[in-house]
A protein has these predicted regions:
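A feature for loop-to-transmembrane-helix boundaries and adjacent hydrophobic helices
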Residues: 1-181
Length: 181
């Protein structure tokens, strides 16, 4: 729809809408091109790159929290946060901190434990675990996160764009783990 009619809007990063999903796809494409150019093994580079990626996600989600972005749905839980501004004066789930912990700390710890296994796991395993882990966490967190205003809910209010984009990540990650060489 909209982007077919306005293709240059895809690059309007000042309008928001930047997503980890798109960044991951771009990173993979760029990484594969660089690996081919320098004759490097793409699976090895991908596995090395994703070991520290959860820490970057953790810092990014903490920045989202500090900036009052990507807040959660209203809650009556004692740790609800009042963000003010467009979020209003009601306590909300600190979904950014949930993501920082699960996508960041927990996923980093899982990858660290796996990196110490002997013998070494097959190439592509770490990439698979990272992609699948991110997809699972993001899919679940979307239940307590306010969907992007410009997208809302899809498929008759059943699913968010974040959830829809996370499902292929779970499948791709699982496939990478199963078929790792």
């Amino acid at each position: 729809g909209y982007y077919w009619a306005h293709p240059l809007e895809i690059f309007a990063t000042n309008e928001g809408g930047m997503s980890f999903h798109g960044g991951l796809v771009g990173g993979i494409i760029g990484g594969v091109l660089v690996c081919r150019m320098y004759k490097l093994d793409a699976w090895t580079i991908a596995d090395l790159a994703v070991i520290g990626a959860p820490l970057a996600l953790c810092l990014g989600r903490c920045a989202n929290f500090v900036n009052g972005e990507l807040w959660g749905k209203p809650t009556d839980l004692p740790w609800g946060v009042i963000f003010g501004g467009t979020a209003g004066d009601m306590p909300r789930h600190p979904s950014q901190l949930y993501e920082a912990f699960l996508e960041g700390i927990v996923l980093f710890c899982i990858l660290q434990v796996l990196s110490r296994k002997k013998p070494l796991l097959p190439q592509g395993t770490f990439m698979g675990v990272f992609v699948m882990g991110y997809g699972i966490v993001r899919f679940l967190i979307e239940f307590v996160r306010v969907p992007d205003a410009q997208l809302g809910y899809l498929l008759g209010g059943v699913i968010t764009m974040g959830q829809l984009l996370s499902l292929p990540l779970v499948i791709a990650g699982l496939a990478l783990i199963i078929f790792a060489r």
